[in-house]
Structure formats: C-alpha cells, structure tokens
C-alpha cells in the first residue's frame, strides 16, 4: 500500500509523515543555563528560573523553559499548604494592612542547630510592604535587651516603623521592650495567641529561609551561621525573584552597611561572595570560620 493511499484511508495529511523536529540553535546553551540555575538554586521552580534567565539577557518565555524543565526531568518544588486568609471576601481587613515602606515591620524567631546539636535562635525582621529582609541576627540565647539592641541597629539605618507585628513570645511582650518601642514612636501589633497566620508575611519568609538555606547547610560555629545567614539575606533582597513582586527582588538597590555597630554585616563583608552570575550566598571554604 502506498503512503498516499494509507494517509487517505486514515484521513491524515501526508505532511505529518515527513515532519522532523527542528532544534533551535540556542537550545543546547539554554538547556545548560537552565540546568545550571536549577542546580545552583535547588528550590526554585521554572518561573523563577525564567526571571533569572531574562535578567541574563535571554529572550525566552516561561512555556519554553517549562518544556525544557520537564524534558530534563527537573523537579518543581511542591506547593505549600495554604495559610489562613488575611482578608475577608468583601475586602474588609482582618488585620493591619501594610501600605508603604516602614508602615509595618514584622519579626519572629527561627530555630536552627550547629553540628554539635546546640540550638541557635535567629531573629528575622522584614518590611511587610517591600518584603525586604531588614535583619537576620543569630544568638544562642535572647533577652528583651538583645532584641532592643538588634532593633536599634536597624532603625538607625532604616528609620522607625509605624507598627511592629509579632507573636506573644516572652521577648516580644517584655515590659522593657514595650517601653522602649513606645519611646521611639513605634506601635506594637500583637497577633492572637495560637494564630501564626496573622503574621503571614514573616511566617512565609521563615519557611523560605528554612527551605532554601537552613535545610541545606551544616553549621560548625556561630560565626559561620552569622556570615552565611547575612549572605543569604543579601541574596534574598537583591537577587532572588519574588513571585508577589512580579518576580523582582525586594530591594535590588540594597547594599551592605559597613559600620554603625552591625557586627554580623561587617563580618560578612570581609568574605566576598562567590563569583557566580547570580551572587550565590555560599562561599568557598572559609578556613577562618573553623
């Protein structure tokens, strides 16, 4: 049976029997770029990878990146369970909505461990409007006095916020801290006990910090965790695409301060970042940390 007759019987165009997939000239280079970025940023999906590629000058859409992503067997990170909603269906506000930078800051603790099993508590501070991470400070133990010192360092650089949102942890509800905040003009905004979704911006940041940084590192000293955490903070603010900001970083213009008593930042500036296209927060082996 001829090809012409067979195609007529199945009502199929003859051109489909001669079609050959043509690969674009840049297909191999783009594939390498995607796999390199997926290796460097193991928790990023194809949408964030697309944003990084465009920043590098690639004229590529997310559909093409997704096709290569799936063809290469790259795994898209699983979705997190949805948190409690922040607003009702009619648009009325459940809680204070950030309207401009320095309107609402939120802070919370995240726990980690060094290689010897000892606990490290990291105090994270973010601006809810810009999503910028203003501080990650690590200590073995925290008191209200240390929290005041940490907040004062940031306020010298960024100004005083109108509101500070937090849970009801003992360090945050301490009388000395509340008195000091009142003196600066900042108002406290405590969430309801047992309702972490009311501090959703900071909880979301904490999950990214743990997923993209803490879960992939082994820390041998407090100096090491402080240096690497500060580098990750700078990476988060200046490089990492943020989905709610149109896949732009929260503060691409941010730079490391070099003085004003911000000890962790000064330490971080003494060890330059890796010379990678996107400024990975990880460094080469730092003998000084061990």
Could you tell me what each predicted segment is?
Residues 25, 164-168, 172-181, 188-211, ...:
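RNase H-like two-metal-ion nuclease catalytic core shared by retroviral integrases
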Residues 136-137:
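Short hydrophobic alpha-helix segments
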Residues 7, 11-104, 195, 249-258:
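Basic, flexible linker segments flanking DNA-binding modules
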Residues 45, 130-132, 158-163:
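Short, surface-exposed connector motifs at secondary-structure boundaries
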Residues 182-184, 208-290:
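C-terminal domain-tail junction helix/linker
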Residues 59-126, 144-150, 157-162, 270-290:
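Mobile-element integrase/transposase regions
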Residues 6-10, 17, 33-34, 49, ...:
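Mobile genetic element proteins and their domesticated derivatives, centered on retroelements
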Residues 76, 187-188:
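Hydrophobic beta-strand scaffold residues
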């Amino acid at each position: 049976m001829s090809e012409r007759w067979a195609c007529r019987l199945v009502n199929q165009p003859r051109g489909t029997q001669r079609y050959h997939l043509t690969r674009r000239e840049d297909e191999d280079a783009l594939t390498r770029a995607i796999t390199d970025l997926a290796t460097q940023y193991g928790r990023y999906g194809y949408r964030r990878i697309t944003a990084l590629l465009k920043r590098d000058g690639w004229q590529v859409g997310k559909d093409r990146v997704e096709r290569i992503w799936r063809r290469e067997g790259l795994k898209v990170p699983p979705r997190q369970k949805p948190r409690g909603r922040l607003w009702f269906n009619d648009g009325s506000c459940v809680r204070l909505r950030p309207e401009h930078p320095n309107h609402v800051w939120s802070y919370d603790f995240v726990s980690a461990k060094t290689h010897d099993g000892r606990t490290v508590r990291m105090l994270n501070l973010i601006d809810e409007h810009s999503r910028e991470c203003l501080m990650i400070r690590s200590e073995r133990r925290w008191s209200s006095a240390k929290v005041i010192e940490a907040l004062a360092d940031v306020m010298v650089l960024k100004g005083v916020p109108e509101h500070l949102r937090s849970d009801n942890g003992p360090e945050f509800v301490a009388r000395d801290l509340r008195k000091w905040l009142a003196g600066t003009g900042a108002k406290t905004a405590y969430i309801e006990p047992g309702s972490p979704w009311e501090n959703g911006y900071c909880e979301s940041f904490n999950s990214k910090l743990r997923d993209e940084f803490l879960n992939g590192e082994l820390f041998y000293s407090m100096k090491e965790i402080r240096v690497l955490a500060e580098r990750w903070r700078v990476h988060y603010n200046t490089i990492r695409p943020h989905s709610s900001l149109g896949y732009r970083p929260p503060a691409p213009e941010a730079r490391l301060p070099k003085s004003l008593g911000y000890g962790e930042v000064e330490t971080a500036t003494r060890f330059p970042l890796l010379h990678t296209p996107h400024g990975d927060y990880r460094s080469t082996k730092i003998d000084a940390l061990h």
